[in-house]
Amino acid sequence: MIDTHTHLYSEEFDNDRAAVIARAKAAGVTHCFIPAIDSIYTDRMFALKNDYPDYVFLMNGLHPCNVKENYKEELAHVENLMPTHHFCAIGEIGIDLYWDKTFLKEQQEAFAWQIQLAKKHKLPIVIHCREAFEEVFEVLESEKGDDLFGIFHCFTGTEEQAHRAIGYGLHLGIGGVVTFKNGKLDQFLKNIDLQHLVLETDSPYLAPVPYRRKRNESAYIVQVMQKLSDIYALPESEIERITNVNATKIFQL
């Protein structure tokens, strides 16, 4: 299995990171893809890569929740990092209006700029969207093309929004929310071809049932796979195979 989205550098793993990674490997997780947040976490990400060079793969980008007054400095940091490392994607990037709409204009500008950066380097994007589907789609519409591809991380939208995202060349990142009773994804996901899905945890956040409200970790991706096996009425091995192929293509492994 491939965990396409995990914050393994998070402080929440500082006391037992090696054990968390050992459990992930024991569960069958072969690759962990690591989204960027902002410049504060850069050193932690590179330290993680140094410790697990063949297991973790780093993205570069500015998280929409961290688009503040200094966002242009942060974007310059992102650009300056590009020659220093082989990044697997630009992410996580997007728009988040859940807590605050103060910086919507700046979030839109940062999102579009980072999409263009990804295109320049022929990299996928990994999108963060919260309470902002229309705003995200507006930017994607302006940037659409054959060179736009990637993952709509932690997809929690409707079936119609799923098809719109796929229409822009994106795969849907499916994580713990699919196991929630109120998650609603299970009501329509079987209408979406598996070739458009990848697995993720977003750990340490959004742990799947039966670990909900506890710290999430990559090993719990098994519960996501099991839920998809139920939804699609396919063996877990087939869910794993197809989503692995999808992730491998996106990240050009």
Map each language-model feature to its residues.
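Mid-domain alpha/beta scaffold segments of enzyme catalytic cores
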Residues: M1-L253
